[in-house]
Regions:
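Hydrophobic face of beta-strands forming the core of extended beta-sheets/solenoids
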Residues: 112, 133-134
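Basic DNA-binding region of bZIP-type proteins
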Residues: 128, 135-152
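Short linker/helix segments within small regulatory modules
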Residues: 123-130
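Short helix-coil boundary/hinge micro-motifs
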Residues: 1-111, 115-122
Length: 152
C-alpha cells in the first residue's frame, strides 16, 4: 500500500480523469480497483459526484459547480487528538480536503488552465502564484502560443 498524504490523495483523486489522454480511471473497473487497493480505500457510489464537485471547487472551468456530501466520522483515539475518518474513498478524499482547508492549504490545489491539460496540482510556490501544472510542458507551450499570437 502507498503512503498517501492529504495533498497526494486529493490531487491523485482529481487526476483520475485525464483530459489530455482521454482516460477516466473511474470508468475502467480494473484501474479503479487498483487505484483503491494501492491506497487502502473502499469504493464509493459517490466517487464520481465528489470528483466533479471538487474539480469545480478548485477551478476546473468545464465542471459545473455542485455540492457533495458523504458520511464521515470524528474519531477520538485514547490520548490523541480528534480526527476525521471515513470508510470509503469519497469520505476519505473529502476528509483530506477538509484538513487542507483547515490548514489554509486548500487554495493551493489548482487546475492547470491549459485547455488540453486541466491536470490538478498542488502549488508549492512561496507566494502561491504557480499557474501551470508544469512550466516545462504546459507553461512553455501556452507562453509560446501567446507570443506567436501577439506577433501576428
Amino acid at each position: 500500500m502507498v503512503v498517501v498524504t492529504d495533498v497526494d490523495l486529493v490531487v491523485d483523486f482529481l487526476n483520475t480523469v485525464d483530459h489530455e489522454a482521454h482516460t477516466d480511471v473511474l470508468s475502467d473497473p480494473d484501474a479503479w480497483r487498483r487505484w483503491l487497493t494501492d491506497r487502502g480505500l473502499a469504493d464509493s457510489a459517490d466517487a464520481r459526484a465528489v470528483r466533479t464537485a471538487l474539480r469545480a471547487a478548485v477551478g476546473d472551468p468545464l465542471e459545473e459547480a455542485a455540492g457533495a456530501a458523504v458520511p464521515v466520522t470524528v474519531e477520538l483515539p485514547a490520548g490523541g487528538a480528534p480526527r476525521l475518518a471515513a470508510t470509503d474513498v469519497a469520505g476519505a478524499v473529502l476528509a483530506a480536503a477538509s484538513r487542507l482547508a483547515v490548514l489554509g492549504q486548500w487554495g493551493r490545489v489548482k487546475i492547470c488552465p491549459a485547455d488540453d491539460c486541466r491536470w490538478a496540482f498542488y502549488d508549492r510556490s512561496r507566494n502561491h502564484s504557480r499557474t501551470w501544472c508544469s512550466m516545462q510542458a504546459c507553461g512553455n507551450r501556452e507562453k509560446a502560443r501567446a507570443w506567436r499570437s501577439a506577433r501576428r
